[in-house]
């Protein structure tokens, strides 16, 4: 098994050795159970040491993994009776955003999220999870429908950013995102947003104005990619690792800064190792959020959302700056 991430190399090597010993014991009469148990204990300790001390750049790499669970994966494990809706009723449908009606423990909800592909063919269909304007307009149509029928809205954020192509700009990409920000601020139903992978720039914000904002432990949320920031600040995109540490884009950092409400624990090694278990962690967070928000009146929901985002802009900086060489 080849390591997908450099910091996982010692883990993969030990897992491979354990697998080889288990196969050897099956093919021979030798009892190696004590040695296997010793290696498994060593593996557990090694995994704890690595995954409890991940650097920001490590988390960026995990968030970008092709087999990281997507919106549709979580919909399958968190909701029942999901009915997908298509189209923005103006131009067309956008496969980079999925959305529809579902039930969460019997409660009717509207679910919307960015959708990446897991291979080249699917990524071409999903445009690598980078929405066009019709994707954001489809999302807004579903949000207004939820507002009309008093259904809570749950948004999953997972995109490098909105698609920057010429056709998208011609169809009003910036206007579509801005309209979503404006309209989401005034929705009279609970809105819960969860960053499940990459939360990139305005493309993420287009689904990100909610009463509660949560992040998975190894997800990221930023105005620009580390590579882009490094190119702007230091004229060298190879300094992306340094930029990731400077930008404060990880869930632990953003929780400390008060940007997000809750960091959702991930299974050991990342959500891709056990999507069912990961969904159970998210299920508990969603239940707690809904329990809190459903107690609020329409006016209180709008006011709480307004105060939340108003507070994000309040910062105090004393003699701190990022040097540009």
From Swiss-Prot:
Pathway assigned in UniProt: Lipid metabolism; malonyl-CoA biosynthesis; malonyl-CoA from acetyl-CoA: step 1/1
Pfam families xref list: ACCA
GO MF, one annotated term: carboxyl- or carbamoyltransferase activity
Activity control note: Inhibited by pyrrolidine dione antibiotics moiramide B (CPD1) and CPD2.
A GO cellular component annotation in the UniProt record: acetyl-CoA carboxylase complex
This protein's UniProt keywords: Antibiotic resistance, ATP-binding, Cytoplasm, Fatty acid biosynthesis, Fatty acid metabolism, Lipid biosynthesis, Lipid metabolism, Nucleotide-binding, Transferase
Effect of mutating residue 199 to S: Resistant to the pyrrolidine dione antibiotic CPD2
Tagged with keyword Oxidoreductase: no
Reaction catalysed by this enzyme: N(6)-carboxybiotinyl-L-lysyl-[protein] + acetyl-CoA = N(6)-biotinyl-L-lysyl-[protein] + malonyl-CoA
The family this protein is said to belong to: Belongs to the AccA family.
Subunit description: Acetyl-CoA carboxylase is a heterohexamer composed of biotin carboxyl carrier protein (AccB), biotin carboxylase (AccC) and two subunits each of ACCase subunit alpha (AccA) and ACCase subunit beta (AccD).
NCBIfam families: accA, AccA_sub, PRK05724.1
Function description: Component of the acetyl coenzyme A carboxylase (ACC) complex. First, biotin carboxylase catalyzes the carboxylation of biotin on its carrier protein (BCCP) and then the CO(2) group is transferred by the carboxyltransferase to acetyl-CoA to form malonyl-CoA.
Protein name (Swiss-Prot/TrEMBL): Acetyl-coenzyme A carboxylase carboxyl transferase subunit alpha
């Amino acid at each position: 098994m080849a390591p997908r991430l450099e910091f996982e190399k010692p883990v993969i090597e030990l897992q491979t050795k354990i697998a080889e010993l288990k196969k050897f014991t099956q093919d021979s009469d030798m009892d190696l159970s004590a040695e296997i148990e010793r290696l498994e204990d060593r593996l557990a300790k090694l995994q704890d040491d690595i995954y409890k001390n991940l650097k920001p750049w490590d988390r960026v790499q995990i968030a970008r993994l092709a087999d990281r669970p997507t919106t549709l994966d979580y919909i399958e494990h968190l909701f029942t009776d999901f009915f997908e809706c298509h189209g923005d009723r103006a131009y067309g449908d956008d496969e980079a955003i999925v959305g529809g009606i579902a039930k969460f423990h019997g409660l009717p909800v509207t679910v919307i999220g960015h959708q990446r592909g897991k291979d080249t063919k699917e990524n071409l269909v999903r445009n690598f999870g980078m929405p066009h304007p019709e994707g954001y307009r489809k999302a807004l149509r579903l949000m207004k429908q939820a507002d009309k029928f008093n259904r809570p809205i749950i948004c999953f954020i997972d995109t490098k950013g909105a698609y920057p192509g010429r056709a998208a700009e011609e169809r009003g990409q910036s206007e579509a995102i801005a309209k979503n920000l404006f309209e989401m601020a005034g929705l009279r139903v609970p809105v819960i947003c969860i960053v499940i992978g990459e939360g990139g720039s305005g493309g993420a914000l287009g689904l990100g104005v909610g009463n509660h904002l949560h992040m998975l432990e190894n997800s990221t949320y930023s105005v620009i990619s580390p590579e882009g920031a490094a190119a702007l600040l230091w004229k060298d995109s190879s300094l992306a690792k340094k930029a990731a540490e400077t930008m404060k884009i990880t869930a632990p950092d953003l929780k400390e800064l008060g940007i997000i409400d809750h960091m959702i624990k991930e299974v050991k090694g990342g959500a891709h190792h056990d999507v069912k278990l990961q969904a159970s962690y998210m299920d508990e967070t969603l239940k707690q959020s809904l329990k809190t928000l459903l107690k609020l009146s329409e006016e209180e929901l709008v006011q709480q959302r307004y105060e939340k985002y108003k507070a994000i802009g309040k910062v105090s900086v004393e003699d701190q700056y990022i040097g540009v060489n």
